[in-house]
Design a protein with these regions (language model features):
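Accessory, usually C-terminal, subdomains that scaffold auxiliary metal cofactors
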Residues: 83, 91, 127, 138-139
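Terminal amphipathic alpha-helical/low-complexity segments used for targeting or macromolecular assembly
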Residues: 1-25, 132-140
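Conserved beta-strand-loop-alpha-helix hinge in the C-terminal portion
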Residues: 116-137
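Residue-level marker of positions within ordered structural domains that often coincide
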Residues: 5, 63, 125
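Left-handed beta-helix
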Residues: 24, 30, 35-36, 41-50, ...
Length: 140
């Protein structure tokens, strides 16, 4: 509606965009191309750049960013295929391609292309550091 529409359709697109942003905290830039079946079960904190080209049946969880990085050329896009599930707190950045039937785990950082029929996770390490007992050391 916004890209190829008449003046009235573009104005309506701007109005819808502002309403989505203010009511739900969703920032989908005008110019993003999204196929049917977009599912956003928890809608807070969603950001999608106008450089996104998204297929059908995408599921986005809360606090997900599909964004471009500085220095992208005019013809660089983030391409996301069909039947993609993106977990919460995920950041997808740059001119990359995500294939069909991909699952991206929560809290992932994606800056490289992902082939079709894949599961992508960002490995994180956790470490528990014990607190020194200051009484035993005579510090207190």
């Amino acid at each position: 509606m916004y890209i190829y529409g008449s003046k009235k359709q573009k104005k309506t697109g701007l109005w819808i965009n502002r309403k989505l942003n203010s009511k739900f905290g969703i920032d989908i830039e005008l110019g993003a191309v999204i196929g049917y079946g977009l599912d956003i079960p928890h809608h807070m904190g969603i950001v999608i750049t106008k450089k996104a080209r998204i297929g059908c049946n995408l599921s986005l969880k809360q606090n997900t960013t599909v964004g471009n990085k500085q220095g992208l050329k005019e013809d660089d896009f983030i391409i996301i295929g069909n039947n993609v599930d993106i977990g919460a707190n995920t950041c997808i950045i740059g001119s990359i391609t995500i294939g069909d039937n991909v699952t991206i785990g929560a809290m992932s950082f994606v800056n490289k292309s992902i082939p079709a029929n894949s599961i992508y996770i960002t490995k994180k390490t956790s470490e528990v550091i014990p607190v020194i007992n200051h009484k035993k050391m005579g510090l207190i």
